[in-house]
């Protein structure tokens, strides 16, 4: 037997190298085979419910790192709730209707307008479901636990029926109406858009300054006067029916030198406009208040059949332009509102594809709206005073990335204005984890217009509306519920397969259809109405979930999207918000803080991370960032996270190895019998348990990450485990001191594994497989550790906090000695301490082998004053010299008792007593040489 064999060197087959890319799929198959998700739900039956309702990602393409961050975050929350006494099922979902899928089919050569609509919709459905299958595997590979075999998908008959019922309740309450208000119109999609489908980009436009000649000045202006107008959308002049001024804005009548014409502009803008128009020696003839100009009539710049009326509007400012705006009620919301109030014609001169129509005039007909500027300039002639290119923020279609226009077309609307205050009242009851989120959602609802819910597309849920022979729209409870039942049985494609009369209840009549003939609506619903109905299609309809949901968690862009549409439909139906809490996340940016895009080549695919690092590293990264704001990710950042993971793993490996001979049922030492340092570590770890449990409850992942890493690096590695080898390796295998420390090791190991499970489930299960005395098959079926309280807890913490200060001072003294070449390693040191009474009392209270805690071979507590050469602090001073004696071959301490023993071992007296007591046979035979 060799001397080293008398050491209790930790033994374990738990590998240092994780091998996550290959091991994770193996664990996941095992979980699936063992039906872990179902078993966890069965365990928690009857416990308080917690419903995190999954916002549905769009079923198109591979998942990106933003998807991964979102689903991992949800998984951490659901797992932690399941391990904290809650029944927390997770039903993943997908959003499957809408334009992107139509665009994919178009790129594949499918021509929608040349094939049977039902066949086309079948292709859309097949493609959407193929994407659901693909993304489902992507999410499962991240280790996300949920009811993957029974997700919700917005194209299923049961979901579509639930959506129709949401619409029906809104219709019954009078919230649905048809109007021709201007809406966001995407010529590139040939459809109306909702606010949530708009994004803003900078756009360079041609702006024109031109003049309208006064036709009837109403006794205020002469007919040789011109009112100066500014526009950034020249094509809309073809539909201009008025000029709007601000009632309280001052306007001036001016005549520039050498100009026969007189002009009206805002007084505040005269100087800048004179410079722009090249006017010199401008004479101000008169000043008017805007309201004095009301109802003056002007000529249209070129259309002699049109008169333009001067009207008043609150939206007019003097921030730019001329203080006077031309008004085309068919092409703008403000224009529409003031136009309707003044009985102006709502003219629309652009068709659904962005092409100028016949009513725009023969010179414009057939041109694309953006290309008409030269024609407009030609038609204006000498009425054009100036033109310039301006860059401004402009709305774009978020899918096609093309600019949109405002365009008045008949659409179906949800009248948010009718129940706006109810919605705002409900927002006040929701808990927002970001206060700015509440303000943002509140302001959006407060300021938003009515919701355009109709779309002129094919792939979506039909609006369940019929038309009588006289054109009356029919949407009554009887017909809508009948449609819902048809959809529930056959799916929404039946709407296109049957005639209108075959979609109505048997025997249905309507006074507007004396001949019994009906037509059906051909528009579909906005996809935000699809996902915005999920509270009914899923949360209400799935018995395992509770409504309202406890939590909605999505990206911050969903304040105008899913958070918004879900809130509107839920309040409209039931008067309550669909969620009790909202947690929002920022966007994932690259390592430089730039937005990720394929064109820049700076995207990171979750699959690439899984291949290089493993999903665990991506999961750990999610906890390492403040996801309430935008976050950065790169392979370099993930490499740093991987290093942190390695530190966590190897620390826990040390605990596994050094409890391999520990049976908790037989070897555990009661808390009251632990040494002071072991009690301190038990209490410190219990503080970590509380911090992490509280952070899980508040969804504060970064708090968990910081607390965990700090505990492992500072409390364990830099302190407790730093001197642990002197105990667990050297003391007798069954000695009290070793069992005391193993008791703490095992307690930390088991509980920290449970605490890690929501974040690192693969690693936690791997560790659990080495803990033979734990009863649960899988750690995921266990509970998070409870927070404990201990006698004299605060007193012990105070004592050891003071000792840590003392230890830091001692380490400075040892470092100085090392720099002066007095010692090499700290075990070569004889440390002399010159304490005052406070420190002396402290060291007595610590009641431990202080030399062992400081990892020095010899320690002396001196009486009297410290020598001048000592390193002094306020309460204590130190001197360091080389310890006397020889190095013990077993414990590596320098000890004056070290000597060669009769059994061929050069060891100290302490080690000799251990060896002689525990290895009598080897002592009798003598040890082999090294």
Swiss-Prot record:
Locus of motif 'KMSKS' region: 595-599
Residues the entry annotates as binding L-isoleucyl-5'-AMP: 554
Database matches in InterPro entries: aa-tRNA-synth_I_CS, aa-tRNA-synth_Ia, Anticodon_Ile_BEm, Ile-tRNA-ligase, Ile-tRNA-ligase_type1, Ile-tRNA_ligase, M/V/L/I-tRNA-synth_anticd-bd, Rossmann-like_a/b/a_fold
Residues binding Zn(2+): 888, 891, 908, 911
Residues engaged in binding ATP: 598
Keyword presence, Ligase: yes
Cofactor list: Zn(2+)
Quaternary context: Monomer.
Name of the featured protein: Isoleucine--tRNA ligase
Gene: ileS
């Amino acid at each position: 037997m060799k001397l080293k064999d008398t050491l209790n060197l930790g033994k374990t087959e738990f590998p240092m190298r994780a091998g996550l890319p290959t091991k994770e799929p193996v664990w996941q198959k095992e979980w699936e085979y063992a039906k872990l998700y179902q078993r966890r739900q069965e365990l928690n039956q009857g416990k308080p419910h917690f419903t995190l309702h999954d916002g549905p990602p769009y079923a198109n393409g591979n998942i990106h790192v933003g998807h991964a961050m979102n689903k991992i975050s949800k998984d951490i929350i659901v797992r932690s709730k399941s391990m904290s006494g809650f029944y927390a099922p997770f039903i993943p979902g997908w959003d499957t209707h809408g334009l992107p899928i139509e665009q994919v089919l178009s790129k594949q050569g499918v021509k929608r307008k040349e094939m049977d609509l039902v066949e086309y919709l079948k292709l859309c459905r097949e493609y959407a479901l193929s994407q659901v299958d693909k993304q489902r595997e992507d999410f499962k590979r991240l280790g996300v636990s949920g009811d993957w075999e029974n997700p919700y998908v917005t194209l299923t008959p049961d979901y579509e029926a639930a959506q129709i019922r949401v619409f029906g309740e809104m219709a019954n309450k009078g919230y649905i109406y048809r109007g021709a208000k201007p809406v966001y119109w995407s010529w590139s999609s040939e459809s109306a858009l909702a606010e949530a489908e708009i994004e803003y980009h900078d756009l360079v436009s041609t702006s024109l300054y031109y003049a309208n000649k006064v036709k009837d000045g109403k006794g205020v202006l002469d007919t040789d006067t011109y009112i100066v107008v500014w526009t950034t959308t020249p094509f809309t002049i073809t539909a201009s029916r008025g000029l709007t001024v601000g009632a309280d804005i001052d306007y001036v009548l001016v005549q520039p030198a050498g100009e026969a014409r007189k002009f009206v502009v805002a007084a505040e803008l005269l100087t800048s406009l004179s410079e722009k128009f090249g006017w010199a020696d401008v004479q101000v003839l008169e000043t008017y208040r805007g309201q004095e100009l009301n109802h003056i009539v002007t000529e249209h710049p070129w259309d002699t059949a049109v008169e333009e009326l001067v009207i008043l509007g609150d939206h007019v400012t003097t921030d730019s332009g001329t203080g006077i705006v031309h008004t085309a009620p068919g092409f703008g919301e403000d224009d529409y509102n003031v136009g309707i109030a003044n009985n102006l014609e709502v003219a629309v001169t652009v068709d659904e594809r962005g092409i100028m129509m016949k009513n725009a005039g023969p010179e414009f007909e057939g041109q694309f709206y953006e290309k008409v500027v030269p024609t407009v300039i030609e038609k204006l002639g000498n009425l054009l005073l100036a033109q310039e290119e301006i860059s401004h923020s402009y709305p774009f279609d978020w899918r096609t990335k093309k600019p949109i226009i405002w365009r008045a077309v008949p659409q179906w609307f949800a009248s948010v204005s009718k129940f706006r205050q109810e919605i705002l009242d409900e927002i006040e009851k929701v808990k927002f984890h970001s206060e700015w989120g509440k303000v943002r959602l509140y302001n959006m609802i407060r300021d938003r217009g009515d919701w355009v819910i109709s779309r002129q597309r094919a792939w979506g849920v039909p609006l369940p509306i019929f038309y009588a022979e006289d054109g009356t729209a029919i949407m009554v409870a009887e017909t809508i519920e009948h449609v819902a039942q048809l959809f529930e049985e056959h799916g929404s494609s039946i709407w296109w397969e049957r005639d209108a009369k075959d979609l109505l209840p048997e025997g249905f009549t309507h006074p507007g259809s004396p001949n019994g003939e009906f037509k059906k609506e051909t528009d579909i619903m906005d996809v935000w109405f699809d996902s915005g109905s999920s509270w009914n299609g899923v949360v209400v309809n799935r018995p395992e979930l509770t409504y309202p949901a406890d939590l909605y968690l999505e990206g911050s862009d969903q304040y105008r999207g899913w958070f918004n549409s879900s809130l509107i439909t839920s309040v409209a139906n039931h008067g309550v918000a669909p969620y009790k809490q909202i947690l929002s996340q920022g966007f994932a940016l690259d390592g430089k803080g730039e937005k990720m895009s394929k064109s820049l080549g700076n995207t990171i695919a979750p699959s690439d991370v899984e291949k290089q690092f493993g999903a665990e590293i991506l999961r750990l990264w999610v906890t390492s960032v403040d996801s309430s704001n935008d976050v950065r990710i790169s392979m370099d950042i993930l490499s740093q996270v991987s290093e942190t993971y390695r530190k966590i793993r190897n620390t826990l490996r040390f605990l596994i190895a050094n409890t391999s001979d520990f049976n908790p049922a037989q070897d555990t030492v009661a808390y009251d019998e632990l040494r002071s340092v072991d009690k301190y570590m038990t209490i410190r770890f219990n503080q970590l348990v509380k911090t992490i449990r509280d952070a899980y409850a508040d969804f504060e992942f970064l708090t968990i990450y910081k607390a965990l890493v700090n505990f492992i690096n500072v409390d364990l590695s830099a302190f407790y485990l730093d001197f642990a080898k002197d105990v667990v390796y050297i003391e007798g295998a069954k000695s009290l001191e070793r069992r005391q420390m193993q008791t703490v090791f095992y307690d930390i190991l088991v509980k920290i594994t449970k605490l890690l499970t929501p974040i690192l489930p693969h690693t936690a299960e791997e560790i659990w497989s080495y803990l033979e005395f734990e009863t649960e098959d899988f750690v995921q079926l266990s509970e998070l550790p409870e927070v404990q309280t201990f006698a004299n807890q605060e007193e012990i913490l105070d004592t050891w906090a003071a000792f840590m200060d003392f230890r830091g001072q001692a380490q400075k003294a040892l470092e100085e000695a090392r720099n002066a070449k007095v010692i090499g390693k700290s075990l070569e040191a004889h440390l002399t301490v010159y304490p005052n009474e406070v420190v002396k009392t402290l060291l007595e209270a610590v009641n431990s082998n202080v030399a062992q805690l400081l990892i020095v071979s010899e320690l002396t507590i001196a009486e009297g004053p410290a020598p001048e050469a000592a390193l002094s602090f306020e309460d204590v001073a130190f001197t360091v010299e080389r310890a006397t004696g020889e190095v013990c071959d077993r414990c590596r301490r320098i000890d004056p008792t070290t000597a060669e023993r009769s059994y061929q071992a050069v060891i100290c007296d302490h080690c000799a007593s251990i060896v002689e007591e525990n290895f009598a046979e080897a002592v009798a035979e003598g040890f082999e040489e090294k």
